[in-house]
Amino acid sequence: MEMQLGAMLYVYKGEYGLPSIDFECLRALCLLRFTRCPMDVQTSSNPLRSGAGKLPYLQIGNQKFAGYRQIKRVLDLEGYPIDAHLSTKQKHLSTAYANWVFTNLHAYYHYFLFGEPHNFDTTTRGLYAKRTPFPFNFYYPSSYQREACDVVQVMAGFDVNDKLDKHEGDYLVVNAKKVVNLLSRKLGRKVWFFGDTYSEFDAIVYSYLAIIFKIALPNNPLQNHIKGCQNLVNFINRITKDIFRIEGYSSVKLTKTPSGTEASLTASERKFLDSELNTKIVAGVGAVLAMGAFAAWRGIYNQLTTRSSTDYDGIDYEDDEMEEGLD
């Protein structure tokens, strides 16, 4: 396989200046850009074509490699290992730190983006729906919500489907703040966590913190805490602006960094946001019509065919194996 010939990485398009809205996509992008791998990136993507029902995926010719682990394995084999410049000791430290960050930030990320009802309904659902083709965009984001339910149940011990007063969000916030404090101390005044060279650990930290810090969620206690750690803010902004200056995207330009509770918008931007309700109503009517037409077609088709039906009747999402740590 030649990485230069026809290789393409498919990811969700970004927002709020980020190159992608999704953690897995963002750290896959870090693999490419940190190592300067000569590969094109496609953001107008259909997750259903990945073979796993999700993004990211890498395609080389007719071969597809879905998910971060497979993508990293291909890049390692092709001569673009992200930790090549680290010493053996640093590699072990990187793995240990990554496991600790994963343990304490993964549940926070899933809960506050997908499990917290108001955040999901007002922000996250729309971000993923707009990046998924019609008519799948009306129910595809819910697959991430179901995955978040499993993650939170295993890692935090409560069910996001319970009443809101039973959600132990404070527990997630306390642990996440401890992680941010340690990361800030570990980074200090360095450019990267291990000095002058990037690592997979930098990619993991950036991917978590950039999304949590940049995406304007109504309820996001960690956002202001990150804002108080100026070296981490500089870390996020430097990578976003310098390394992802081409992929970074914003559909609505904010006049200041989102604070999680308010953002200063121009008159035209407010008009854009006010139109969202009308857009959702029209889209909902379209979804009903599309589903009705599909149901009618299925009925006619089943009457005309005698073979047993194994037709597409929804999306089976193959859940990624829960990682015990970030390799």
Curated annotation (Swiss-Prot):
One of its GO terms (cellular component) is SAM complex. InterPro entries: Glutathione-S-Trfase_C_sf, Metaxin1/3, Metaxin_GST, Mito_Protein_Transport_Metaxin, Sam37/metaxin_N. The keyword Methyltransferase does not apply. Its main location: mitochondrion. It comes from the Eukaryota. One of its GO terms (biological process) is protein insertion into mitochondrial outer membrane. It is found in: Mitochondrion outer membrane. The keyword Cell membrane does not apply. The chain crosses the membrane at residues 281-301. Keywords: Membrane, Mitochondrion, Mitochondrion outer membrane, Protein transport, Transmembrane, Transmembrane helix, Transport. Associates with the mitochondrial contact site and cristae organizing system (MICOS) complex (also known as MINOS or MitOS complex). Belongs to the metaxin family. PANTHER family: FAILED AXON CONNECTIONS-RELATED, METAXIN RELATED. Involved in transport of proteins into the mitochondrion. Essential for embryonic development. This is Metaxin-1 homolog. The lineage of its organism: Eukaryota, Metazoa, Ecdysozoa, Arthropoda, Hexapoda.
